[in-house]
A protein has these predicted regions:
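Structural and coupling elements of P-loop NTPases
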Residues: 1-718
Length: 718
């Protein structure tokens, strides 16, 4: 197998809603390039993609699969991505290293919610797409309706390059209006017969050819002038115009296929080779310094790691794209994150689980290596002489949160390690032990996402665990000024303890004026003026301002750190529910000492109890985390979705309709979002999706606070 240069490589990403035939199309592409001599199928569990046991069980893609094929003396790297939005992290990784998306549509369904979701990701990641109406051999295939739905919903203008002569189970021919030929397929082996367009189809073909010509001319002034001058464009001119339109992400060429029968696959691959942007024409990668990294084969090597995997008997497999230069077996690179050197002992091209040894990979190519030390997804490997770091993948925020509980006592530590290892392969999984909540919290893209992870862990590691409702990281604060004093006094034998602290607390807010001539609540005309100030950004959010207004030596300065420590300890376990307290100003204005018995522990305990008493008298409030939620839903289901959100104490921030879908924005308490993905799927027959991002902390309603206080009291009594 030859080493391919950047001009001989195309990197494509297969995207589309679940069930659009991406894996079957990838299989047909590998067959056409003779990487395999027989096409596998989903039903028989022998495709290059979907090659894991769990994918065989579910009969769907769960992980992205990297494969390649050789065609027209070019190398086509293919990344087959899952259609389910629960596994969208794979698409973000794939589009980081892929230059163009091949966007599949089910000929029976056309544009679906899954299509809308993946189109949004393609727009977000600024990738051009080629449209493929697949499964035209299905019983209810309707090419015209599918294209019309694409036209109605897509922000990128579709243009027909091919249309079927017949469709449904009899589908075996299409007309290519770029080449102005008809192609007919007799067997399911990809062999085609090129024919002239039948007379009864000629008018339609010519009309669509004219639309294609006009679309190509729109994207280039020279082509537009040529079109006005000659009234048409050559095939090469059309390709040139489509190249420009694709690069601008303004046009989506539409093709006809049946991946299952290998109809139209070869022609699609020809178009990708001839028209789709490759490493030299696609936008350059950016470094973390904002500099462009061109695909220059002569420059010092740079490779970007977009996928990490652990395989039994092999260990860690690192998938990367060579961004610049070339990498050969034995090349020594530096991991720019860790500073450690990594030696690439072996190089492979990838075809699913099959790995083909390479001696060298050049700029623009994709491959893998094994047994690197501490390299993971989003790392850059670079020549030590020019250690540039590639801008990392920004993965989507988690949308599902649960607590983890091992079924067998004693499995907690092992389970924690296994869950943390899962993050190595899937960066959209977040796992942490919350000291605050005393739970192991796992976050992912949806309930299905985490259930798949659990199934895999149970089978591979023989560990069983449950997902349970996670506790909510509430916060406590105050709403008014309060004063308290507390004397800690203890006598034990010869040694005693004595410390008395008087304090004022009030709510803190950004930009509030400094305290001057501070009137002490409940102390008549008593006024204090703070002398010193300390300000702390709290690890859990918010601030603490700590002032000393001590005069006349009532409390030695050496005891002030102990007083601060006592306050911080109580803020670490708030007086109401044990949640963190935040956004408070404390002024220590008086106190008493004993010449013998006063010590740090005495003042710490006095401050702790004075703070607790003052807090309870300062209009204490519980605050809850609020999330911005965006729901994308077909218009027919909007009423049910909105009603459900309002039952979750949501505040509707806005709605807008967009090409058959409604986008609803709301702020929702985190406490109301547990298992929301499951409810949303049930309400909309699986046709909606949502995203969520932390917004702020807000006070809970009075009835909710009463319930939380009662629950905490009941737990405390137990």
């Amino acid at each position: 197998m030859k080493n391919y240069s950047a001009k001989e490589i195309k990197n494509i990403v297969l995207i589309g809603a679940p069930g659009t035939g991406k894996t079957t199309l990838a299989e047909a592409m590998a067959f056409e390039g003779k990487v395999i001599d027989r096409r596998g199928s989903i039903e028989t569990n022998n495709t290059l993609s979907d090659n894991t046991d769990i994918e065989h069980e579910y009969k769907r893609s769960i992980y992205s699969t990297i494969l390649f094929t050789e065609f027209m003396d070019r190398k086509l790297n293919i990344i087959d991505c899952p259609g389910s939005d629960d596994f969208c992290g794979s698409l973000f990784s794939a589009f980081k290293v892929g230059d163009v998306g091949v966007f599949l549509f089910n000929a029976q369904n056309g544009w679906e919610v899954g299509s809308e979701i993946q189109a949004r990701y393609a727009r977000l990641l600024q990738k051009p797409v080629i449209g493929v109406v697949n499964q035209l051999d299905a019983d209810k295939a309707n090419f015209e309706a599918a294209v019309e739905s694409i036209r109605a919903s897509s922000r990128v203008k579709p243009v027909i390059v091919q249309y079927p002569v017949n469709q449904g189970p009899e589908f075996n021919a299409f007309i290519d209006v770029l080449l102005m030929k008809m192609y007919r397929f007799k067997d399911n082996d990809g062999h085609r017969e090129e024919l002239e367009i039948p007379a009864e189809e000629l008018d339609k073909a010519q009309e669509l050819n004219k639309e294609l010509v006009e679309m190509a001319a729109e994207h280039d002034e020279a082509l537009m002038e040529l079109y006005f001058d000659k009234g048409t464009l050559t095939q090469d001119d059309i390709r040139a115009g489509l190249k420009i339109g694709l690069s601008k992400r303004e046009v989506m060429p539409i093709f006809c296929t049946s991946g299952k029968r290998d109809i139209g696959i070869k022609r699609l691959m020809e178009f990708i080779i001839n028209v789709a942007p490759g490493p030299l024409k696609a936008p350059n990668f950016l470094s973390t310094d904002g500099e462009e990294i061109a695909a220059d084969e002569t420059a010092p090597a740079v490779a970007f790691v977009f996928k990490s995997q652990v395989e039994q008997h092999i260990g860690e497999i690192t998938y990367f794209r060579v961004i610049r230069g070339r990498i050969a077996e034995g090349t020594e690179l530096v991991n720019t994150r860790t500073g450690n050197k990594e030696k690439v002992s072996q190089l492979f091209a990838v075809a699913g689980r099959n790995r083909i040894k390479f001696t060298e990979l050049m700029a623009g190519d994709i491959g893998c290596t094994v047994k690197l030390k501490g390299t993971r997804t989003n790392d850059t490997l670079a020549a030590p002489s020019a250690p540039v770091t590639v801008e990392p993948i920004v993965f989507p925020e988690p949308r599902y949160r649960a607590a983890v509980k091992a079924k067998e006592q004693g499995d907690e530590e092992k389970l924690g390690k296994v869950l943390n290892d899962a993050k190595f392969e899937d960066p959209t999984i977040l796992v942490e032990y919350s000291k605050e909540l005393k739970q192991t919290i796992i976050q992912g893209q949806g309930e299905h996402h985490l259930n798949i992870l659990r199934t895999r862990i149970e089978k591979e590691n023989r560990l069983q665990y449950d997902y349970i409702a996670p506790k909510i990281p509430y916060r406590e604060t105050i709403t008014k000024v309060a004063q308290a004093d507390y004397r800690h006094k203890k006598q034990s034998g010869c040694a005693g303890q004595f410390g008395e602290v008087h304090m004022i607390i009030e709510p803190y807010y950004e930009g509030m004026p400094e305290p001057k001539n501070y009137k002490v609540p409940g102390k008549g005309d008593m006024v204090v003026n703070p002398k010193t100030k300390e300000e702390y950004d709290l690890p859990w959010g918010g601030k603490l301002q700590f002032y000393s207004a001590i005069v006349g030596g009532a409390i030695d300065a050496r005891f002030m750190p102990a007083i601060l420590k006592g306050i911080m300890e109580k803020m670490d376990e708030g007086p109401l529910t044990g949640s963190y307290a935040r956004d408070i100003r404390v002024v220590i204005y008086d106190g008493k000492m004993h010449p013998v018995d006063s010590n740090e522990i005495s003042f710490k305990l006095a401050a702790r109890n004075a703070f607790k008493e003052a807090f309870r008298n300062a209009g204490p409030k519980i605050m809850e985390p609020i999330y911005n939620v965006e729901v994308l839903v077909p218009s027919d289901y909007m009423g049910a979705v909105m009603s459900d959100l309002q039952n979750r104490r949501a505040m509707i921030a806005g709605m807008e309709s967009d090409k058959g879908f409604d986008r609803l924005n709301a702020t929702v308490p985190l406490a109301e979002l547990y298992r929301y993905s499951t409810t949303l799927s049930s309400l909309t027959s699986g046709s909606a999706t949502y995203s969520m991002k932390f917004s702020s902390y807000e006070q809970v309603p009075a009835d909710v606070q009463d319930k939380l206080l009662k629950a905490y009291t009941d737990t405390d009594e137990e």
